Amino acid sequence: MTARSHDLGATVAGVHLAFCAMNAPEALSLPHDLRRLVTSRTGAIVLRTATVHPFLHPEFRSLHNPGYDKLVPLVRELVATGGPPVVATIAGANVEEYGFLARAFADAGTAWVEANLADPWVAATVAPFEDPRTLRTLARRMTEAAAVPVAVRLPERTSLPYARVRDVLADAAVRIVVVRNDLGGLEKFVLEAGTAFDVVAVGGIHSGYDVRRALAKGAKAVQVRSALVEEGPGVFARLEREMRMARG
């Protein structure tokens, strides 16, 4: 790694990323698309949300996946390339499934495991933000099961105030929080929850300026969604180039 690549990197929960931008999990889902990220400038490779069993529910298309047992070998393959760190994203029908999935992906070599608590299916099944005890139990189950850092992705709105969410997640030893890159997400969370976590902002990234702006507002790194879908893996090189140009 050169000094010039290092200066746009990030350290998230002790994991070094060569670049502070990575893919959002919903942007790419097929194995061959994820493999293309290995040689890109992305800071990490984030897998599509995985569930215990194959998920094909017609009302929740955002969670469609072949099941964790098909994705664990992909994690091992990607890790073996020596490319960017690999991040697993998981969703469970109950607290036990979150713990099971966290252990399975951590053991496969992921850099951290992200609990997707933002999907409507999770709100309908686990409902982690209706009772802080549920959120605490879920988070603790994951941090106790996984030997790697745990991240929690928050929904657009939570019934619990962010300060309460901070207390619950910090008590459970969660180290990363993923929030929407907007006023009600990133800015409000940083304002109300402080600096207890490494924050990753997702969405709203179309230029190097957008990345710099998110970092200035308190994010450690960003996840790229629509720009990646439109441009492909080359978007990360463009974002990096634009950030360097802005620095002169």
Where are these regions (language model features)?
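N-terminal capping/small domains of soluble enzymes
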Residues: 1-86, 91-93
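Short His-Asn-centered micro-motif
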Residues: 23-26, 154, 202
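Flexible loop residues that form catalytic
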Residues: 26, 50, 118-120, 181-182, ...
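Alpha/beta enzyme core
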Residues: 35-40, 44, 93-200, 208-222, ...
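C-terminal helical cap(s) of enzyme catalytic domains, especially alpha/beta-barrels
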Residues: 55-60, 215-216, 221, 226-248
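Short, basic, helix/turn surface patches
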Residues: 73, 141-143, 247-248
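Short donor-sugar binding/catalytic loops of nucleotide-sugar-dependent glycosyltransferases
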Residues: 205
